[in-house]
């Protein structure tokens, strides 16, 4: 069964083998290199049915926390991702982009916006440790808009879908945890409210 074709909504996969997202830190300036393009093509050529890309930083000023992670907010980056997608599809693979906001893992001084601190639900990176910027409602809207914009770009580039990174203490996960989300508005309190941010993300239309 694992090697049989599989219908995933509007995508037909040649098998049920999926490559998980793995950060590679090989995209200086946020632009995937020729080596990155070749890397993904090789995986498709080896008959991986579905490839989920490494985390792509959302086009938001506070999304980054690590060097040489790819982005979508430049012409050069978009063109490079088009080549990644073409390489995968030319080898009969399918590909989903993973969008990633690092939240409180970001520190002042990090590129590409060294003056911008990390953003979290309540300014906390762990219970009692407030070292980040507490997101306002405007910040939350801007972040959701950034996800929506990047999802649209992914569609235009030719990705088969988008996955949103929601684990490991990054921004979305930070909203889920009662120890790091002590907000008193519609995005904090009950688990339903702490899930409101990701719920809003899931409802974006592109």
Segments and roles (model prediction):
Residues 1-102, 143:
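N-terminal capping/small domains of soluble enzymes
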Residues 14-17, 48-57, 117-122, 161-175:
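Short coil-to-beta-strand
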Residues 30, 144, 187-200:
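Active-site glycine- and acidic-residue-rich loops that bind
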Residues 39, 80-84, 139, 143-151, ...:
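Alpha-helical packing segments of well-folded alpha/beta enzyme cores
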Residues 53-76, 101-111, 164-188:
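Glycine-rich, proline-tolerant flexible connector loops at the mouths of alpha/beta enzymes
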Residues 67-75, 132-141, 189-192:
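The substrate-binding groove and active-site-proximal loops of carbohydrate-active enzymes
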Residues 100-159:
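Non-globular sequence segments
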Residues 204-206:
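Conserved small/polar residues in nucleotide/adenosyl-binding loops
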């Amino acid at each position: 069964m694992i090697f049989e074709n599989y219908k995933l909504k509007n995508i037909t996969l040649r098998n049920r083998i999926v490559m998980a997202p793995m950060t590679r830190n090989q995209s200086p300036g946020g632009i995937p290199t020729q080596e990155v393009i070749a890397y993904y093509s090789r995986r498709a050529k080896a008959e991986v049915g579905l490839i989920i890309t490494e985390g792509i930083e959302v086009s938001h000023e506070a999304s980054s926390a690590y060097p040489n992670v790819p982005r979508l907010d430049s012409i050069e980056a978009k063109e490079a991702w088009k080549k990644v997608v073409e390489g995968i599809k030319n080898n009969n693979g399918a590909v989903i982009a993973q969008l990633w906001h690092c939240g409180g893992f970001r520190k002042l001084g990090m590129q590409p916006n060294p003056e911008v601190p990390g953003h979290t639900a309540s300014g906390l990176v762990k219970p009692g440790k407030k070292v980040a910027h507490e997101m306002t409602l405007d910040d939350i809207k801007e972040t959701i808009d950034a996800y929506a914009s990047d999802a649209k770009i992914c569609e235009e580039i030719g990705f088969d879908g988008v996955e949103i990174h929601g684990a490991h203490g990054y921004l979305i996960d930070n909203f889920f945890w009662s120890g790091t989300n002590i907000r008193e508005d519609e995005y904090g309190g009950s688990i339903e409210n702490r899930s409101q941010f990701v719920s809003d993300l899931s409802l974006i239309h592109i």
